[in-house]
Amino acid sequence: MLSTLARAATRRPLTVMLLWGLFLLLGFGLGTGVFGRLSDDVPDVPGTESQVAAEHLDGLDPAGDSITGVVEAAAVADPAVRAEVRRAVADLREVAGVAEVPDPYATPGTVAEDGRALVVSVTLEGGLDDDAEEAAVDDAADRLHGIDGSAVSGVHVSGGPLLGQQLGERAQEDVKNAELISLPVVLVLLLVVFGGLRAAGLPLLVAVAGIAGAFLALFGFSHVTDISVYAIQVTTMLGLGLAVDYALLMLVRFREERRHIPDVVEAVHRTVAAAGRTVLFSGLTVAVSLAGLLVFPSTFLRSMGLAVAAVVVVDMLAALTLLPALLTRFGGRIPPAKARPEEEGRLFARLARFAARRRVAVLAVAVPALLVVALPVTGMSINLGDARQLPKSTEARQLYDAIEAHFPPGTGVSPVTVVLRPGTDTATADRIGAIAGGTTVRDLPGGTTVLELPAGGAADGPAATELVERVRDLRGDAPVQVTGSAAQLVDFRQMLADRAPWAALTVLTGIFVLLFAFTGSVLLPLRTVATTLLSLGAALGAVVWVFQDGHLAGPIGAEGLGALSLTAPPLIIAIAFGLAMDYELFILARMREARERTGDDREAVVTGLRRSGRVVTCAALLLAVVFGAFMTGGFSPILQIGLGLTLAVLIDATVVRMLLVPATMALLGRHAWWAPKPLRRAHERFGVREEAPGPAPAPPQPAAR
């Protein structure tokens, strides 16, 4: 397959570049439409009690979405403010698609006790199509923002479909800013690596293809499932980072090949045959790591896993087709690598020899140190999060802060909703209804009764969680179901706990098979997984320490929220594990190549690290720059994911790959490459091998006359 791709790219480079040009137009033209289709992060898990109950209620009483406005003033009872608000309420009731707008002055609980704020709730009609709903939301928001006057100090509007629209606009701005920050820095680093603009510019072209692929993949998935506002940032930063990494690996190999092969086309073929296989397996390992997300029956996690996997495939194809085509056309102008193999990477060779010579000491220091950093993971907690996760400049966050400042805890939080199906006995209904004060009752068609219990605080707080568990304990065998945000979180946490072992088994099995196919060893995959888990645990522990416990949160613009976003841990684990496999394959490819050439196991470790250390370090720095740029947006989940991935790649590329890998390889010795005879025969037949670089082929001799 790789030889076919190489031939196509070298024989028809202009055609390949034209096809990728059309792909870029499609990605940046059609794909950017995804920013208008983003939603806030909802942990729906099909088949769970909370989701089944919510769907049952929607079928009986298809209520429309709602938006909320908070009006702040020195005194909302001021006649001028009252007149402005009531004028706006009257206007809102005339908006097409609006079902209900209660008078805040006549509705209990909507005027703050301090008299300095009030809430205006706008409920839309159910069953509106997308265009009608968007028009109604925009019109209603404009009329709420129209509440002004000298006595009004501020109006904040958000919620429902407006929240998704606001987050989409902010996400688009953040992605643009992150690209403007990261691309110039990446270019500077590539200039340092390659010493010339021609070579440095090619990875950026591949990166642009990765970004277009991210937009297009998400736009496609947005037509079949909800796409979280955080998905666009995660996929874009990963698409950009991996594209640069893969292009870097290919370009470094191309320059090495050009050192002894004058023919550009031949050098491209040998680059694809050697480094291309590493890129292919790297992409597959990242995709397998993300396959673990498909085990979770969560629409969000599955759509995220599929979207990111699609982006990885686009990056991989761009590195294997677009870059070879570009090298065919412009590679002759790129100077070959200057240093000889025995001269390059001396620092990494010294590190490898030190770690191999002091392997027991290195393991005795590095492993406990990483375990200590990972300790906070044992107390990790996740929650739904609230508007505190949003940047303070977003209107949704400003609305949240206004409610927090003027109203009692729990105001504006969705209640714990209890669905009493037909057949529920009166005694059970009475016991549940008496749990919390302020319970409201609604009767729906078909004999269903709904109890709405005040959550008593944030939907992801301990009071709401305890309330859900108490209701479920009290119902016995009665046909009673609990839904609402708090119940969704309880079910989501339980789903993660139930499916996490299966997800881990899926990922580890897939990784083991791929690494065995790549190396022919059964011990190397086990060693790789063990060392990768150390770096992953340390990175996740640091994220918990910063964001959950609140240490050092200020310098990076975060807040100690007492828990991580429910999206952060699974995404950090899946993506970081795949990225770590990337670096492992970069190093193992060089080690195996040196071992097959020399037969010396220990020297192969040194040579492998010497030849790959610079690439791995540069790749980690480039990814860290990209992840860091996306952390400037201020979304707390993105800050958590960005910090986790940045630390994971830096720890993995330094402590793990530069110290633990040579130390463990030296400890295993020749047994590192061991496999039972049946598996060894299977690998000889079905395994994957790279073509090692060698001298340029001799020129053809003229035919005898």
UniProtKB/Swiss-Prot annotation:
Keywords: Cell membrane, Membrane, Transmembrane, Transmembrane helix. It is a multi-pass membrane protein. SUPFAM superfamilies: Multidrug efflux transporter AcrB transmembrane domain (SSF82866). The chain crosses the membrane at residues 16-36, 144-164, 177-197, 201-221, 232-252, 280-300, 306-326, 360-380, 504-524, 528-548, 561-581, 615-635, 636-656. It is found in: Cell membrane. The keyword Transmembrane helix applies. GO terms for cellular component: plasma membrane. Pfam families: MMPL. Belongs to the resistance-nodulation-cell division (RND) (TC 2.A.6) family. MmpL subfamily. This is Putative membrane protein SCO6666. It comes from Streptomyces coelicolor (strain ATCC BAA-471 / A3(2) / M145). The lineage of its organism: Bacteria, Bacillati, Actinomycetota, Actinomycetes, Kitasatosporales.
